[in-house]
Amino acid sequence: MLGAALRRCAVAATTRAGPRGLLHSARTPGPAAAIQSVRCYSHGSQETDEEFDARWVTYFNKPDIDAWELRKGINTLVTYDMVPEPKIIDAALRACRRLNEFASTVRILEAVKDKAGPHKEIYPYVIQELRPTLNELGISTPEELGLDKV
């Protein structure tokens, strides 16, 4: 995708040059000066953290979500270079419970622990925030199941 954008920029730059070189001399600034400041690779707006969280909570709260969409969402969420907010994890756990996907709940919690990496304070914080949901839904953590000792 980036390669295609760079090719478009290169083609656009070569079409602005005529057979005798650039259309404008170097002494007189013209449209070429404005073109140089355009970033050909950046487009679209950045998603804020709140919009990101809302998008994923909405995704997992869909009433007609099926097991495949649930796993696809979890896999996509895990690929991001961040630990999801507890409210996203809460929505995902509730979707797992609606679909009776207990294995996915354990997988989500294991992924959160893995994504926390060397930051040992993140996973306990997430579990603390999710404890009411875990108790309500009857979900055990991997540690409670003894999976951390395997």
From Swiss-Prot:
Organism the protein comes from: Gorilla gorilla gorilla
An annotated Gene Ontology molecular function: metal ion binding
Highest taxon of source: Eukaryota
InterPro entries xref list: Cyt_c_oxidase_su5A/6, Cyt_c_oxidase_su5A/6_sf
Taxonomic classification: Eukaryota, Metazoa, Chordata, Craniata, Vertebrata
GO biological process terms held by the UniProt record: mitochondrial electron transport, cytochrome c to oxygen
PTM section of the record: In response to mitochondrial stress, the precursor protein is ubiquitinated by the SIFI complex in the cytoplasm before mitochondrial import, leading to its degradation. Within the SIFI complex, UBR4 initiates ubiquitin chain that are further elongated or branched by KCMF1.
Keyword tags: Acetylation, Heme, Iron, Membrane, Metal-binding, Mitochondrion, Mitochondrion inner membrane, Phosphoprotein, Transit peptide, Ubl conjugation
Pathway annotation: Energy metabolism; oxidative phosphorylation
Motif (SIFI-degron): 2-17
CDD domains xrefs: Cyt_c_Oxidase_Va
Record PTM N6-acetyllysine, positions in chain: K87, K113
UniProt cross-references to PANTHER family, sorted A to Z: CYTOCHROME C OXIDASE POLYPEPTIDE, CYTOCHROME C OXIDASE SUBUNIT 5A, MITOCHONDRIAL
Presequence extent in this chain: 1-41
Quaternary context: Component of the cytochrome c oxidase (complex IV, CIV), a multisubunit enzyme composed of 14 subunits. The complex is composed of a catalytic core of 3 subunits MT-CO1, MT-CO2 and MT-CO3, encoded in the mitochondrial DNA, and 11 supernumerary subunits COX4I, COX5A, COX5B, COX6A, COX6B, COX6C, COX7A, COX7B, COX7C, COX8 and NDUFA4, which are encoded in the nuclear genome.
Subcellular localization(s) per the UniProt record: Mitochondrion inner membrane
Role this protein plays: Component of the cytochrome c oxidase, the last enzyme in the mitochondrial electron transport chain which drives oxidative phosphorylation. The respiratory chain contains 3 multisubunit complexes succinate dehydrogenase (complex II, CII), ubiquinol-cytochrome c oxidoreductase (cytochrome b-c1 complex, complex III, CIII) and cytochrome c oxidase (complex IV, CIV), that cooperate to transfer electrons derived from NADH and succinate to molecular oxygen, creating an electrochemical gradient over the inner membrane that drives transmembrane transport and the ATP synthase.
Membrane topology label: Peripheral membrane protein
UniProt similarity note: Belongs to the cytochrome c oxidase subunit 5A family.
Name by which UniProt lists this protein: Cytochrome c oxidase subunit 5A, mitochondrial
SUPFAM superfamilies tied to this protein: Cytochrome c oxidase subunit E
